[in-house]
From Swiss-Prot:
The gene is carB. This is Carbamoyl phosphate synthase large chain. Its EC number is 6.3.4.16, 6.3.5.5. Mn(2+) 1 binds at Q282, E296. Composed of two chains; the small (or glutamine) chain promotes the hydrolysis of glutamine to ammonia, which is used by the large (or ammonia) chain to synthesize carbamoyl phosphate. Tetramer of heterodimers (alpha,beta)4. The large subunit is composed of 2 ATP-grasp domains that are involved in binding the 2 ATP molecules needed for carbamoyl phosphate synthesis. The N-terminal ATP-grasp domain (referred to as the carboxyphosphate synthetic component) catalyzes the ATP-dependent phosphorylation of hydrogencarbonate to carboxyphosphate and the subsequent nucleophilic attack by ammonia to form a carbamate intermediate. GO terms for biological process: 'de novo' UMP biosynthetic process; glutamine metabolic process; L-arginine biosynthetic process.
Amino acid sequence: MKETPKKVLVIGSGPIKIAEAAEFDYSGSQALKALKEEGIETVLVNSNVATVQTSKKFADKLYMLPVVWWAVEKVIEKERPDGIMIGFGGQTALNVGVDLHKKGVLQKYGVKVLGTQIDGIEKALSREKFRETMIENNLPVPPSLSARSEEEAIKNAKIVGYPVMVRVSFNLGGRGSMVAWTEEDLKKNIRRALSQSYIGEVLIEKYLYHWIELEYEVMRDKKGNSAVIACIENLDPMGVHTGESTVVAPCQTLDNLEYQNMRTYTIEVARSINLIGECNVQFALNPRGYEYYIIETNPRMSRSSALASKATGYPLAYVSAKLALGYELHEVINKVSGRTCACFEPSLDYIVTKIPRWDLSKFENVDQSLATEMMSVGEVMSIGRSFEESLQKAVRMLDIGEPGVVGGKIYEAKMSKVEALKYLKERRPYWFLYVAKAFKEGATIDEVYEVTGISKFFLNKIKGLVDFYETLKILKEIDEETLKLAKKLGFSDEQISKALNKSTEYVRKIRDQSNIIPVVKLIDTLAGEWPSVTNYMYLTYNGTEDDLEFSQGNKLLIVGAGGFRIGVSVEFDWSVVSLMEAASKYFDEVAVLNYNPETVSTDWDIARKLYFDEINVERVLDLIKKEKFRYVATFSGGQIGNSIAKELEENGVRLLGTSGSSVDIAENREKFSKLLDKLGISQPNWVSATSLEEIKKFVNEVGFPVLVRPSYVLSGSSMKIAYSEEELYEYVRRATEISPKYPVVISKYIENAIEAEVDGVSDGNRVLGITLEHVEEAGVHSGDATMSIPFRKLSENSVNKMRENVLSLARELNIKGPFNVQFVVKDNTPHIIELNLRASRSMPFSSKAKGINLINESMKAIFNGLDFSEDYYEPPSKYWAVKSPQFSWSQLRGTYPFLGPEMKSTGEAASFGVTFYDALLKSWLSSIPNRIPNKNGIALVYGDKNLDYLKDTAVNLVKFGLTVYSISELPLQGIETIDKTKAEELVRAKKVEIVVTDGYLKKFDYNIRRTAVDYNIPVILNGRLGYEVSKAFLDYDSLTFFEISEYGGGI
């Protein structure tokens, strides 16, 4: 008998951080839908303003608060839910659930945990309890011992024997974990590992060098019925975090006995923790024989369960929520197929490849080797009918400038076999590119296996691609059969044209003449073995006919955001989903093209049609040929859509909204600067970096510092502030590399200015705009800035000038749809620095802060015009809203934390308040590891910028009850100083509660900043923000905990 609680509290995962990303927007949204179907009132706690689930249509009540136990207790006290779901918000939600249980909050208010119970969660997440549980149930685990202190860890490592793997309990993304080859390795890093455990516990485990890592996803109901949904094979061996691994599904190298044995163990693991819902079980398999160990389990929706859901077409999160309510597997219908129940295990007639995406080039000093800690910020998923096709598609989806496994920059680089093997031994990201290069330079399968541990099955497939490509290069013309084979192996028109030394248009023309076009296949979860109809599709050249007939009519294709990276995250998925919903009123059929397995936009019940495939000109033109889309929308998915807009328009594609030529003017720095000059709109002095002589002349006129800005980039890629000639020439070189087709502009950097933005919508004549003000001064990338609505420090006169400028641009460029304009304001004069003719990163925040969906308004603007009489309209603010960045410094081994014009944050949180400080503090506390300092603790405050703000910060922290030290080498007037060595010792001893600093001081304070983030100590990297947060600490007792609509926000 199922349970029907009247009101359920769902805990979200908070802002996106490395290892806890948009997969929890997807899983949380599905859980909320499953509850709504039952007529259950839902309450959501989540501070991630960028997500789809923090829109009003998903939860009946929404609290945008820090996802921590004391804030959730306030919600429980007010809402009195019957049940709580903690399995849909990642490790963050599980930790909160365990805390609420241990502190007696759930018992006090009679709140029942739905799904897997707390004792089962603790058995799974405490390394010690998990080991004991497996041994009790005769399930194989590697030799290991747990430890709760440095001394115990060192002692147990001697017993287990080196090399050892250090695994961290109650932890996210392998943070703090490592492989220690010697006692010296262990001593150097064990304190950090213990610091990263929520319960101060690690497991010292025998390191299984070059063993194969596999994952199984299992569903289990309250009666113990189980269904194994997917087997996922990691191409990277043990020692590389699964989130860092390239993976395939279904498993490719297992024989039936291996598969069935591990399947049985998976069901036994689920039984041993009394799982209700979904979990994944990770295995290590000896490549030399039938020997396997169970490594761990996650008793919640996870990154791999989101991948499994999208790979198989089985809605794991939806089914899991139903099981948590007491349904049995046979009682739940799989809504993807619409025909089968949830006890049917999926069968695949295709191969899925997932590859992580890294952005390590944005971070100084970062360790470039893949290891036990996750550092990737996103992932892509491709679908093909052969491993080669699937892998090559996935490489292009990464959007890193590589056309496939072969034929790109790395493949054609000057690099010897020895160098390629060296990079492989170091486990550099995108290892498959170096594997191909090694084979091209003459390496053998055995040589590559020796340094990588990657199965020879996969290495042989990559070698086959190299051999085929080298054969292509000696052809003068290509015949029909060879071209067909190339497409079946996943080669793009670009790759083929490079090999033949022809144009892509030439290859496409031959394909069209020979009728070599991809076919559309359905993902039905059952490999066609059972009748079902789905809307979930991919394209392949390994087929003869389409699985569906294409209708005629008024149809729209929406280009999604692709794989997430620094600067492109869940906020663009919010824009895509918002556009899907808004566009359905104007079109007969709306389809989306996207390939990100983490997102809501790639869910089975969001779009009328979902094409899970590449985003590039070739693929969009293929789809238009089949579907005859009337329009293509490129403005909602971030930079990837804008990058192909002009080329699509040149190929006769009708773009929805602003024209591709206007987008080109805005994205091309030189063209845009000339336009501003023509319109008489103020901007920082600039010059196009066409020659060193021009640059020298310009710098002599305006003086340092100057800002180097490439075109057609997102998140400030290669954008740098240069303070000397040496820096300037180095930055120009890098910027030219990242955007070689477009000009680099050098502009005067205006110091000590306010940065502000306008998120807006235009119909070409009028503007709906929302003003956002940054807390940090100009020079900190907008994605890393703390933002306030309404504005606080800008004068009305400045804002009016900004509005005039925006209106002038909207009319000149005939902007139709969403846009974002960035300003630097100095001495009440606004200077425009950037215009983005697309949905912006801050648009979910500005929309929810004002209670008006800017994407919905965009569709009105495009088709009907804006419905107000003023030339420029800004909705009034009812209360305060503040958005804060989430950094993942601790996950990025070795990097130096600092802020500048290139974006570093991985996510964002927001909160609402009756005052600016009420909203600010809750927003800041929503980003980990931020917390209220313990009074009587120590704060370090120092820096070489914003010194007045730093001094005032120190005064506030003293008032709050902290002992504040500055550093004698960088003293602050009136503040007690200690030397740098003493400061480092205090941080290492974990006696420091918070660090507030400013400026780029890597040679001086690298150890202080790095150790602080490694030990989970809050670090504020800007003096102005430090001052505002320290002031907010003084009003900590005045925080408000209202539902979002009580603040007048939400959409």
